[in-house]
């Protein structure tokens, strides 16, 4: 019952301190109360003065030391389980002891409870106050497990002052407390107890490695990189500001000249109205003068009836009227509008001013050690840009090259019959000579081109098949060596008989030479030229060589 009362008193004291200091956590209040022996006034004064931060820092430092001691003296604590059991069984005088030892002894006592479950029945009454104590201490133990978060927040605030060590201490202490709470009860495995402590050290080293890498990168380069990043970000902001300023200036210019335009229009309207008034005034003056002249004219008509005095007065009036005619002239010639346009133009040209940006930036010559790096970077960037340009330009010729082999492959396909027929004609020259003396063959040869000419006139060249072109080329190519052979035989036979034969033989030679040159052209030209050169000579040679072929046929048969 005493322990329950003390627990209730602790809660009341925590609430009392929290009512004065509402922004502090229960963990911090418990630690400060334990430091001042649960004196509420001293704890509140410590929070108000700010000395509670130092108290919490001391708690963290002592927790680190106790954690280290606990790591080193695990075996000693297992040996002194009986002493700890006796301490737990005693009624607790007050919660003046620090809580980390209580948590440390809690699982130890729990282990002894399990180990002493086989004891005699006279020990069972002793277990009842211990269970009460465990139930009482459950909430403070949870509070101490939650101390780590509060301490981490405090130490993060303190780390800004340049003390990162307490943060590491709190983490080690919290890890040690949780590990001791979850520790198995078997004392015969000390290696398993120390393994979680060893596993914390590589994590600490891994956390330090990025800082070490940053230090290796350069002692002060990180600050420079941050400054450069801020400056580059501000450049985009200034660019937006310039655009906004230019837009606002354009709007101001439009507004100013619109106002000037409105002012000019208003002035024009006022001047036009004033000119109308001037016109009316001048006309009134002239009408008055006109009436005066008419009146004087009427008086002059009555001069015969007037006395001398009246005539003298009339002459004086007329003289005065005539003497004022110069004013009439001035009234007619006077310029009613005058304006110094040049001055106004000068004022308009001087109206408004635009401030141009000043390039106050200075170029700093880089150090000689940085020049190779800058040149290499510029060279690599230039190569990449050139490579991108070349790759973009080579895409189109590659397509043309991909299409050209098809055209090239079509050239041999169309010219293959001529290539194939020429060696065949050279090898089988004797057979061709034998075959050309067949009258049926000559009739077919002479009639075939005529038919082909008729069919060519009826249908378009695009409608003709490749087989028809090949059929025309083969007899045409086989027909040329016959002309050559016929010319040679003609020279041999008619050279001795008649002198007229050489004249006939020169004509086939010229035609043969023209045909040979036409055969060589298709290999250099396009496909269209091949078909044209193979078709046109057939139509010419068949009609002209018919008479020439009859001469060797007669001579050789004889």
Swiss-Prot record:
UniProt feature coiled coil, ranges: 271-344
Positions of modified residues (N-acetylalanine): 2
Chain intervals for the UniProt region annotation (Disordered): 63-134, 157-201, 380-525
Compositional bias segments (type: Basic and acidic residues): 80-92, 513-522
Transmembrane found in the keyword field: no
Keywords: Acetylation, Coiled coil, Cytoplasm, Nucleus, Phosphoprotein
Pfam family, one: SPATS2-like
Protein localization: Cytoplasm; Nucleus, Nucleolus
Entries under InterPro entries matching the protein: SPATS2-like, UBA-like_sf
Cellular component aspect of the GO annotation: cytoplasm; cytosol; nucleolus; nucleoplasm; protein-containing complex
Residues where Phosphoserine is found: 120, 455
Descriptive protein name: SPATS2-like protein
Organism: Homo sapiens (Human)
């Amino acid at each position: 019952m005493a322990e329950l009362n003390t627990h209730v008193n602790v809660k009341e004291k925590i609430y009392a301190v929290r009512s004065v200091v509402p922004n502090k956590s229960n963990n911090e209040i418990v630690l400060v109360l334990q430091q001042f022996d649960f004196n509420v006034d001293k704890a509140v004064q410590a929070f108000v003065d700010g000395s509670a931060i130092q108290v919490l820092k001391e708690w963290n430092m002592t927790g680190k030391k106790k954690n280290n001691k606990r790591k080193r003296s695990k075996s000693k604590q297992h040996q002194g389980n009986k002493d700890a059991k006796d301490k737990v069984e005693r009624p607790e005088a007050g919660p003046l002891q620090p809580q980390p030892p209580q948590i440390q002894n809690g699982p130890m006592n729990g282990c002894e409870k399990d180990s002493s479950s086989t004891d005699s029945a006279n020990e069972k009454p002793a277990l009842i106050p211990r269970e009460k104590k465990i139930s009482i201490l459950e909430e403070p133990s949870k509070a101490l497990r939650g101390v780590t978060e509060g301490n981490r927040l405090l130490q993060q605030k303190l780390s800004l002052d340049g003390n990162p060590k307490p943060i590491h201490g709190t983490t080690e202490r919290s890890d040690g407390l949780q590990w001791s709470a979850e520790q198995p009860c078997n004392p015969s495995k000390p290696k398993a107890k120390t393994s979680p402590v060893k596993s914390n050290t590589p994590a600490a080293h891994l956390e330090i490695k990025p800082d070490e890498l940053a230090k290796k990168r350069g002692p002060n380069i990180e600050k420079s990189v941050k400054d450069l990043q801020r400056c580059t970000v501000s450049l985009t902001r200034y660019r937006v500001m310039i655009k906004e300023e230019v837009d606002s200036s354009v709007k101001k210019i439009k507004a100013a000249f619109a106002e000037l335009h409105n002012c000019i229009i208003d002035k024009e309207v006022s001047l036009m109205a004033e000119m109308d008034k001037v016109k009316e005034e001048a006309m009134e003056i002239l009408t008055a003068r006109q009436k005066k002249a008419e009146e004087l004219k009427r008086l002059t008509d009555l001069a015969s009836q007037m006395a001398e005095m009246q005539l003298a007065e009339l002459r004086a009036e007329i003289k005065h009227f005539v003497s004022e005619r110069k004013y009439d002239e001035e009234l007619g010639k006077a310029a009613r509008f005058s304006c110094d346009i040049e001055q106004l133009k000068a004022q308009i040209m001087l109206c408004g001013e635009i401030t141009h940006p000043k390039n106050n930036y200075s170029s700093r010559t880089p150090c000689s050690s940085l020049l190779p790096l800058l040149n290499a970077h510029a060279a690599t960037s230039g190569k990449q840009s050139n490579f991108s340009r070349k790759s973009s330009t080579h895409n189109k010729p590659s397509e043309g090259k991909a299409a050209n082999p098809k055209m090239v492959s079509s050239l041999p396909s169309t010219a293959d019959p001529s290539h194939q027929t020429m060696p065949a004609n050279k090898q089988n020259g004797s057979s061709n000579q034998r075959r050309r003396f067949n009258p049926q063959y000559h009739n077919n040869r002479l009639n075939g081109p005529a038919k082909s000419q008729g069919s060519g006139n009826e249908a378009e060249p695009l409608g003709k098949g490749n087989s028809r072109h090949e059929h025309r080329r083969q007899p045409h190519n086989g027909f040329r060596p016959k002309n050559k052979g016929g010319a040679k035989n003609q020279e041999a036979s008619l050279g001795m008989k008649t002198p007229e034969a050489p004249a006939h033989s020169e004509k086939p030679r010229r035609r043969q030479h023209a045909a040979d040159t036409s055969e060589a052209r298709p290999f250099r030209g396009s496909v269209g030229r091949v078909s044209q050169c193979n078709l046109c000579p057939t139509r010419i040679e068949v009609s002209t060589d018919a008479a020439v072929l009859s001469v060797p046929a007669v001579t050789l048969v004889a």
